Amino acid sequence: MGMNYQEFLDGIDRKAYHEGEWTWEEDGYTVTRTYNYSAPGCHDSCGILLYTKDGKLARVEGDPLDPYANGKLCMRCLDLIEMVESENRLKYPMKRAGERGENKWERISWDEAIEMIASYVENEIDAKGLGRESILVGHGTGRNINWQVPFIAGACFRTANVGGIYFSGWWCYMPRVCGAAGPLGDYPIVDASETLPDRYNNPEWQAPDTLVVWGNEPLKSNGDGYLGHWLNVCVQHGSKIISIDPVLTWWGARAEYWLRPHPGTDACIALAWLNVITQEDLIDHEFVECWCAYYDELKAHVAQFTPEWAASITTVPAEDIAASARLYANAERGAIQWGLVFDAGTSSAMHWTEAVCDLMAICGNIEKPGTHVLVHNSFDINAGYSSVDLYADPKALERKFRKWMINDPGLDFVGMSNCDAMASILESGTVPATGEEYPIKMFYAQSCNAFAGHEGAAARAYKYMSKIPFIVYADPMITPTMVAIADLILPVSMSVERDSARTWWTPLRAMKKVTTYYEAKSDEEIALALGKRMNPDLFVRWDNAEDFINDYLLTDLAVVGEDGQVKKANFSAATDESWGHTSVSDAGGVSITTKCPYTFQQLVEAGGHAYDEWNATYYKHEKGLLRPDGKVGFNTPSGRIELIPSIFDAWGIPPYPVYTPAPETWETTPEVMEELPFYMISGSRSYEFFHTEHRMAATMREFHPEPCVKISPASAAKYGIADGDWIWMENKEGRCMQMAQIFEGMPDDVLSAEHGWWKPEEEGAAPHLYGCFDYNVNNLTRNFQAGPGGIGSPIKCTRCRIYKVQEGDIMPGKQITELGGWRDDYQPMQP
């Protein structure tokens, strides 16, 4: 029997929790009802009650009146005070007092810091005739800074170049977003009632009959604005599980079928499922005939991808592939929860995502309760990466890093700058397609611990990013990346120290400031400080952070003319002329471009959240809610789900789903097996940390003190490794060390290593850099391996060897910072 949600609601003492109030006094504390986001980082934004006394945060509790998380909080959020009060916090702006890497700093004022930045741009870029495109801007995974930092890039620095440098193929989330947009026109998420304000009580909602958890551990990751415990509730309501993952997880232990493909081969299972479902006629005929295009073409194409073919590559038994396909297809309501492996565990992320979207479609698992709902940002508040294009200098916008610069065919369809073009031009100083000079003179990064986090090919990234003449880092903490390469560092506020708002799907949420920390500023305040100095004519529009947030909520940060009317705005939906593009459009002279009914303060006083009716509606395609013209159907050129997406051609992607082997696999390069016998799955998640964050929190480290790599008992015995031994993982790119954790749920030829590790308690100055490079799995990964369309990268199926760490071994930090790394043969656009 499933959880009785009404019984839970009836059990809440609403008077004790001050229903209808957003702040009150309780036992000498001021209590504020709000939502938490970054920093410290999180993919989600759960309702919290913040208890403050004498201006300091004293206690954190979950808010049971919050329908998003129902009062549940993860251990990181409960440990928020340790992060807020961490000795690693950056208190003041500081400029470098010694050489890069020495970790010597001199305190300066915010006015001095802003002037230092503005003067550099004016004297070293503008006065020397260089364009603003020579400024690169980056940020981390803080999910509530996806609109502020791109805006800073365009409006303050007037550059259009924002994104990750060594982030080949945007191998996090972007492949799923784009890969789903092609066939579906929008993004699907598993329906666990999260779009409904009344949640599990909604009379329309039903739990999935079959839940596929694919390359994901949602209870640990809670990724992409999706709480994994919602799926746990679905299981309580009877959902059967299919787990597809080489590593045993909570889901695999409870699954009807646990499929264990070789890393990099999952797409074969998706194609084989399509084969079984089409050949055995298990499709939802009514849905396919009414709402899908190119079914006959898909059926003919996947006839070649039999379960036996998939078994020969994945090593998953053919009978299990076929039987699990039938379990999914025969379910009245089937749902597929996908993870990061779709972006970073394949050489063709777009095709794998396409194949899985096709599975959803031909089984009728779109927009039906308990399947997948198509979602937008609440109230059509879409300011994000493409906001940079609204305000960038027109000449800089023309020289934005794009696909054509690296001879990659097809339209650019991502708002960020092309990562591979960015890295290639940084390395060579020229545009590969033309040979034209393109100097990079400045890098501004906000909440982005790049070397410990997302920068692939870590040694390569350090080598070339260190050559950028002027680097500014803004972050709540002093990080190894900051110490390694920054010239100026700026303190950023934690979530509890800022007023802000963010929409990621639904609901729209507000963060209310309850305390301050020395001279730390919020992202909005930093934008205003930079903008008032560097683009004063524009920034007369905003007097304070609340003005800025209100503009985000009500106009989507659109360009406003002297008459107060909106002139340009972010796209919210495609038109016949705009499919396949990511850009900005004329707004038609309207004064409000979103559907948001709240100002920031009104949202705070409403309890901090607001669900929108659009996301809470099922069968949107039948009601004319998906297309900008108001017609029934889907937001695609044909108006139907395109099982073979026509837009893929425009994007430079072959439109039929296929399997592309990773660069080094047992079936394509068997000679590598002896030298590099293991697949290294990098980036396994933990409850205690969010990417590179929380390593300074004593409680989190008590639960998880060291970086761990899981290894099977048989492989550990073969290499003489005991549980707790430190081992090297190594290939020609480099090596890193982690502590062996023997785990029976591992295949013998697979390792599962953790990412994001550094130790704030270790020496900060180079070569140590808090151990950042010593434990870094990205020492082994490669750049310039993007899949079709420039999307996705197979970094989660890297090959390596292992051996024990010995006293006297050269540490990777020293190898990278003093000895030039492991390779001296890098060539732009070559792995």
Features from the language model and the residues they span:
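Long, contiguous, secondary-structure-rich segments that constitute the structural scaffold
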Residues: 1-15, 346, 524-596, 600-601, ...
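Hydrophobic, well-ordered secondary-structure elements that form the walls
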Residues: 443, 471, 487, 530, ...
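Flexible, small-/acidic-enriched active-site or ligand-binding loops
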Residues: 376-383, 695-698, 705
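Phosphate/diphosphate-binding loops
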Residues: 460, 469-470, 475-477, 512-535, ...
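Glycine/threonine-rich phosphate-binding loop and adjacent beta-strand/alpha-helix elements that clamp
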Residues: 202, 496-516, 527, 531-533, ...
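Long, low-complexity segments enriched in small/aliphatic residues
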Residues: 391, 554-697
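C-terminal substrate/ligand-recognition segments
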Residues: 433, 440, 447-451, 463, ...
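Catalytic alpha/large subunits of respiratory electron-transfer oxidoreductases
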Residues: 2-497, 534, 622-624, 631-633, ...
